[in-house]
Amino acid sequence: MATVSAPVKRARRLRPAPLWLSLLLAFLAYFLLDFSLRLFYGSMSNVSLWAWQPLVFTLLWSGTMTAIAALLPRTGRRIFLLVTFVPFVLLAITNCVLYQLTGTCFSFADLAYAGDGARFISASYFRLSKGEWFSLAVCMAMMLCAVIFMPKARPGRRGRIVAAVLAVACAAGIVVVHNALAYRGDAQDRSEYLSWDNAESHDTFRDTYTDFSNPNRCLMLTGLYQYTVRGAAVTLWPQDTATDQRIAELDDYYASHPKAAADTPMTGAFAGKNLIFIMMESMDDWLVTPEYMPNLWRIEQEGLYFPNYYAPMFLSAGTFNSEFTANTGLIAPEHHVRNSYYAEHALPYSLANLFRDAGYSARSYHAANPNIYNRGQIHLNFGYESYNDYGDLGMDDYMLDSQLLRGYDQIVSDEPFFSFIITYSGHGPYTTEQQNISEPHLDRARAVIDYSTVPYTTEAQKEEYTRAVAQAMETDAFIGGLRERLEADGHAEDTVLVLFTDHYCKYFSDTELIEAIKGTSDHNLLSNVPFVIWTEGITPQVSEKYVSTMDIAPTIVDLFSLDTDLRYYIGNDMFGPDGGVVYFRNYAWYDGKTYDTGNDASTNPAVLAMREQVREQIDISQDTFRSDYFAYLQKRSGETEAK
């Protein structure tokens, strides 16, 4: 007689749970996944954890998915629950990690720029709190129990009818709540709804949901499931903003907002000179010291230095965000835009096009493959004649900025040239994963760092800080080598260097360390980074004006006396009287005295006026690009000339 092993006996005793219990566990897993995410990250916006909108959306989505599962046979039910639940667990983790790194949660727009960042994913970034991991584990355990102990039985006829009715009712409820929150009306109604003389109109939940351009607030307002579905819809299937009405509105705005060039002592100061335009990867202000980066520090001492320069991140892809704005003078839209727009929409006022119109060659240089961010095509659309990667530059290791100098003879020419360079070595993570960058400089880094001034609390933080400094030294080696070559061949006097950082040093695995280093935990204010202009023989200046990436293009236009229409740049000449205010994502702003996020009901007329200006100018700039407005201007101009 065959004997039955103890494990088999125990397995047989694991009876399937009643269907209602397994479905209840699934429902609770769906609901608690969202609730715990909003519980731990509620500080990312002013939406209450108990606001009815996210609670209702999440209850309805949880009900819809659970009711659909009830209608399926056991195998289909198990597959459906796992297929709908596991991706949302991964999205919840992604939102947590991105918020810790960038201050902004995930949006589908990030997928368009994921190529570069994906190669730098590090386990060190997944530093969720114990409470967060515990809540995720509880939710996953509940769903696994629901799946494992799912009975074979299906609901009876009456049960299936009830499940179908619940599924339809919950889905219909989602549509009803969506329609209740989304503003519907013509453009005039919309304009009045958002008018600033209506005290209740500013940044209401309805406004936030309709625009769906503030990821943090939208996630807290709608919950994980509705945020994901609506976010995918507005990003992957953007509405056509190039309507005749919107074009007419842009016409009216630009016609009523002329912008004349400011006549300053710096106007035309570099006319006829060459420009090497360098965007430095993650070179934060605290890295620029005579010990860490002596070459960049020297340039700051001898050049035109702006200590209050900020690099706001309107896209989570911080590098491309600054790359786009610095080159075009426009703010990159996050939603309602396809990645293809960047390679297709007309950009006649980009720096590359303006320099080429002035008789310069214009080429871009970056070690990364041209397929990353689709840079190869996008840079051509910016107006560059070519995009040159590590192979074109003769580099052996694309991560080493010092090897960019192998392409010096391509970057520098005896004919007028404009060269745009993006460095690489400062990119995180600051671990042994990138030791090919840090190892050559580690001994020197350890020798020059005064660890008594570094606010580290663990040995891991100390090592990460050291490797960040070592990687910055590699970028500094390129900067120093470039200056030496320019001086050696006589180009230092006829060539201008403009160096700016794409974003702050955001790749520390422990955000508390970078916050302690920079003295703030606000992700907007963390974006204070280096910006300097240098050429041989220039009189050093330090400007305390508050400026940002959006001011770069109009400043270069004025310095080099380029012919353009300044109305189409959202920023201002850094040396002129206008501007002095930094605009951030979600319409926050900072002028050195007032930092306003728009979350309070201010009655200060000056603050309200600035809020209106910031919101209007950001929307206009983003819609100018979204709607391909410059293509309409070119078409209109062509039709006029034909007549």
Regions found by a protein language model. Name each.
Residues 22, 81-273, 289-293, 300-301, ...:
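N-terminal secretory/membrane-targeting segments
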Residues 1-123, 129-133, 147-151, 642-643:
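Extended, compositionally biased non-globular segments that define protein topology
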Residues 20, 50-52, 61, 133, ...:
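A residue-identity detector for tryptophan
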Residues 25-88, 184-204, 392, 402, ...:
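Charged/polar interaction segments and conserved charged motifs
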Residues 248-643:
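Solvent-exposed soluble domains appended to multi-pass membrane proteins
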Residues 36-58, 149-193, 369-401:
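N-terminal start-of-domain structural block
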